[in-house]
Amino acid sequence: MNLVRTGQFKKDYKRIKKQGEDLEDLRSVIKMLVEGKPLPPEYRDHTLSGRLKKHRECHIAPDWLLIYRIKGDDLILERTGSHSELFR
């Protein structure tokens, strides 16, 4: 699977890094997704609804989310951050 990072994801990633989050957790989840492996239940991976119905969300930590979608052979990383940062 090809990994695609949106411009917004890149901004979110820089912000998360600046906040001192452990990026290894995020990298681990991304690696599983790229390899096509199902995420373990503790990540609470699920489909979103409404305008984001083509997207999925998983929890890196209790209040740290990754929003992504799969289109063909592409894993598109859309956003990462807390609930309040992503759903204003």
Outline where the language-model segments fall.
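Basic, Lys/Arg-enriched alpha-helical interface segments
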Residues: M1-P62, I70-I76, E85-R88
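Active-site glycine-centered loops adjacent to acidic/histidine catalytic or metal-binding residues
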Residues: S82
